[in-house]
């Protein structure tokens, strides 16, 4: 009998989900950094 993980995903599925998460999280961080720079250029906060 195969071991079941807490999430119910296989090792391959978990790797695929993690890779997609890393990609979207990195895109979010880059977008947030660009937004902060643009606001800083528009109206410096200190």
Swiss-Prot record:
Annotated residues for binding of a bacteriochlorophyll: 18, 36
GO cellular component, one term: plasma membrane light-harvesting complex
Topology within the bilayer: Single-pass type II membrane protein
Topological domains, Cytoplasmic: 2-19
Superkingdom, natural source: Bacteria
Gene Ontology biological process terms in this record: photosynthesis, light reaction
Localization in the cell: Cell inner membrane
Location (main, coarse): membrane
Keyword Metal-binding: yes
Record topology, Periplasmic segments: 43-46
Record keywords: Antenna complex, Bacteriochlorophyll, Cell inner membrane, Cell membrane, Chlorophyll, Chromophore, Light-harvesting polypeptide, Magnesium, Membrane, Metal-binding, Transmembrane, Transmembrane helix
Membrane-crossing segments per the record: 20-42
Any one GO molecular function term: electron transporter, transferring electrons within the cyclic electron transport pathway of photosynthesis activity
One Pfam family linked to the record: LHC
Quaternary structure and interacting proteins, as annotated: The core complex is formed by different alpha and beta chains, binding bacteriochlorophyll molecules, and arranged most probably in tetrameric structures disposed around the reaction center.
Similarity remark: Belongs to the antenna complex beta subunit family.
Function: Antenna complexes are light-harvesting systems, which transfer the excitation energy to the reaction centers.
Protein name (database record): Light-harvesting protein B-800/850 beta 1 chain
Annotated gene: B1
């Amino acid at each position: 009998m195969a071991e079941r993980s807490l999430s119910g995903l296989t090792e391959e599925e978990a790797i695929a989900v993690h890779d997609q998460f890393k990609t979207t999280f990195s895109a979010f961080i880059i977008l947030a950094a660009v937004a902060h720079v643009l606001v800083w250029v528009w109206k410096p906060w200190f």
